[in-house]
Amino acid sequence: EINRGEISKIFGELFFAVDPGYRGVAGEVSTQYANLHADSNEKFYIPDNVYIIGTMNDIDRSVDSFDFAMRRRFRFVELRADERLEMLANLNNEEKEAEAIARMSALNVEIAATEGLNENYQIGASYFLKLKNIDFDQLWSDYLHPLLQEYINGMYDEEGIMERFKKAYNQ
């Protein structure tokens, strides 16, 4: 997960080597660790065929320094909560799948309508895959309720907001 560390510091001297224009031997760099090699003149580069794939949770602000210089070296593909509903077919129960989609959709509408939250806080289908082993009530009490409570911690009328979330979930 790319926002779990300060990405510019993690890449350090390889900062430029990440850029597609500096890939391959043409972009080789000498790092501070060159003396650890048998040949201290040996250089490091990122091959053209190596792809760095990272995930990023927009609402996780544990580390908030993904600077623009580093950001422009990556392609961003947004995945919305409602884009992977087909994974719920893995529940192997069409009725449960339909109910999961209905509950997730209703809950996500309420989340997005809550002041201080937005679509980035919506619940994705992967949470509902837990329904293979638990029921809807346990999914709410053990997973969704604690997560949503954390989202709204410190907001005005937390209790009322949680009641609206639960009502939407239980529709």
List the model feature ranges, each with a label:
Residues 1-171:
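C-terminal regulatory/interaction module of P-loop NTP-utilizing enzymes
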